[in-house]
Amino acid sequence: MNRDYLVIVPTYNEITSIGILLPQLLELNLDILVVDDGSPDGTADACRALGLESGRIVVVERKKKLGLGSAYKAGFKYGEDRGYKFLIEMDADGSHQVSDLLTLMSTMETSGSDLIIGSRWISGGAVQNWARRREWLSRSANVYARLLLGGKVKDMTAGFRIYRTAKLIQIDLASVKSEGYCFQIEMTKRMSQIDGVILEVPITFVERKYGVSKMSKKIVFEAIYRVTAWGLSAKFRRKRP
C-alpha cells in the first residue's frame, strides 16, 4: 500500500527538524520527495545523505526561495508523472505527527475521499504550544475564508493533507497562483469547484522545537488579499442577471 503514496516535504533551513522527520517516515516504508528552496544551512545535503542510505528519498534543490505553493506544485507534478495514487503534504518542522499520518492514510483508503485534511479546528483536533494570539489568528483566518468562499471545511489553511491523484489532475495547477499558506485555501477551493469529496480528520498540531517559522506579513497579506478578491468576485457573479 505504501508504494502508492508519495510524501512531499518542502524545506528551507530545516536541517535539524528534517533529520528527525525523515527517519520516522522511512520506518513507514514511504517514498519521500524533498523540495528544497536553496537552504544555506545544508538541509538538501542532509536529505540526500539519508536518501543514499534508504533509496526512498529524492531531493529537488532549487536555487532560490520560490515559496510553498511552487514547491507543492513541483511535487504534485513529480508524483503525477510517476504514477503515485496519493500525494501527501507534510511540514518539515515536525509540527505534523507521523502517528496522525497513519490515521489520515487509513481514512483515505476507506472513505473514498479525494482530499483528506488533517484538521486542527474540528472536534478532536488540537494545537500544542501556541500563543493565544497565533491560535486566534489561525481560527479567524479560517472563519473569514469560510464566510467569503463558502463550504464546510473548518481548517482551510491546514498543510497536512492527502490528495487522490486521479482527482487532483483535474485541477489546472498552472493557474494556481498562491505562494504562501494561501495555497492551501486556494487548493481547497479548487477541489470543491470540481466536486471533490473533502473530509477533515482531527490531528494534534505541535509547535516546532527547532528552526524559525516561515510565517510573514507578506504571507498574511497575500491570504487576505486573495480570499477577499475571490469572495467579492463570486458575489458579483451571483448578482449578474
Please annotate each region the language model reported.
Residues 1-4, 150-151, 174-241:
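Hydrophobic helical membrane-anchoring modules
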Residues 3-5, 26-34, 42, 56-57:
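Short loop->beta transition adjacent to catalytic acidic/histidine clusters or analogous donor-positioning motifs
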Residues 11, 35-37, 62:
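Conserved sequence signature across two-component system core domains
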Residues 12-27:
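Short, well-formed alpha-helical segments that are part of the catalytic scaffolds
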Residues 16-20, 41-50:
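Acidic helix N-cap motif at the loop->helix transition within catalytic regions
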Residues 36-45, 94:
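A conserved acidic beta->alpha catalytic loop
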Residues 62-81, 86, 98-181, 208-225:
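Acceptor/aglycone-binding surface of glycosyltransferases and processive sugar-polymer synthases
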